[in-house]
Amino acid sequence: AELAPIAHRVKPTANPFPAQLRGHASAQQTAAAVEAALQSPGALLADGSFAAEAGFSEATELALALTAAARWLQAADARGLALEPVAARLELLLGTGRDLFFTLAKFRAARLLIASLLDRAGLTAVPRIHALETLSSKTTLAPWTNLIRLSVETTAAILGGAQSIALRGHDAASGTASPEALRLALGAACILREESHLGVVADPAQGSAALEQLTEQLATAAWALFQEEQRGAKDGSGLVAKGDAESAPKFADAVTRRRESIIGVTEFPDLGERAVAPAAPASGPAAPRRWSQPVEAARAAVEATTPGARPIVALHVGDPSEKLRPRIAFAKGLFATLGYRAIEVPLGSDSAATVACLCTSDALLAEQTPAFIEAAKSAGAHHLFAAGNPGDAAASLQAAGITDFLNLATGLAPLLQRAAQLTSETK
């Protein structure tokens, strides 16, 4: 594969459709851009990468790329142009994804889908497929971990058949990659190409039952979405609306419930880490989304209330046995995602923290809650959490003064939902 690590975008090509779908260009402007592109030489880009940036499913991204390819052919046919030369100018652009196997299968499915589309039109062209490193998986906290994500995503795209890859740098989530980030991206690309020789073997995933099945599933789902769009709006707007409706709750649920681990953000956060300033979040249809953004924003808000100091949460330990250590570590990790430094105190002790959490066994939770509430409130705590599963006693414990419960089922949701309240009363 040809790697282009220092480019922020693939080589200039005609690519008018994403701007229209995102509401940045009118139908008249898009039509004029299409007319100009068809009359000039150069590649015609069938772009699905913006869907990956917005967190759409792999099938939706593939369907949008197919829709763009079909729009180019339909526009050329409407103008009486020969379709074979136009098809020869088509190039696909797909985004990388955080899942190695889904990304690999997506690029394999793309080749099958575009070949099927052109074959049905009686065309023999074989379009090139490009990959763009997307920022949806990148973090502003612990940005060095993005180097691992970048390498995994690039590997998946190459093994899936991408013929060129544009890398953006590990700190590109700030809006502009630094020279150092571009240098490291170049190094990663060179290692994958010159030392790992990933682009030498054609379709190395061929024969893997799991990957063959996943490729077929993605191709089938994408083709069904593409056909549905052709029966409707035909321009991709239906796919964008569907993708937006699905991706927002998917992002929120995956992160807040910690079903998707983000190293350095939701798992193993470093309290000494300084985040790079994030780019301003976009809005509108198919707006780019980053998985880590809600947690990073909540942590930044908490830290802003205590400049020069670290906010503290007091963990009231009600069971000194070693069996409780995993629960204490779990609570520490949850609060650390919002920038809190946890201190352990015996149950009933005074502390200067405005946030407190009871850490005890489920069997002792109801019994020890009154002593915890009395001690925490007398110390000035405004928000009282309990780590554990209260079962049927949840309602009565909350009526007594517990703000919420922290466990595997709730994940980060109680803390993120109350981030504004926590920051307003943090001292």
Positions of PLM-derived features:
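Catalytic alpha/beta active-site cores
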Residues: 1-99, 128, 158, 164-168, ...
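ATP-dependent carboxylate/acyl-activation modules
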Residues: 273, 280-343, 399, 404-405, ...
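Short glycine/threonine-rich loop-to-helix capping motif typified by GTGT followed
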Residues: 58-62, 97-109, 134-148, 175-185, ...
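Mobile "lid/hinge" segments at catalytic clefts and subdomain interfaces of large enzymes
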Residues: 40-73, 148-226
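A glycine-rich phosphate-binding loop feature that marks nucleotide/adenosyl-phosphate handling sites
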Residues: 47-53, 86-97, 126-136, 169-176, ...
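Glycine-rich anion/phosphate-binding loop at the beta-strand->alpha-helix junction
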Residues: 66-69, 93-177, 181-185
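Intrinsic disorder at enzyme termini
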Residues: 163, 199, 224-313, 319
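Short acidic low-complexity segments
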Residues: 344-352
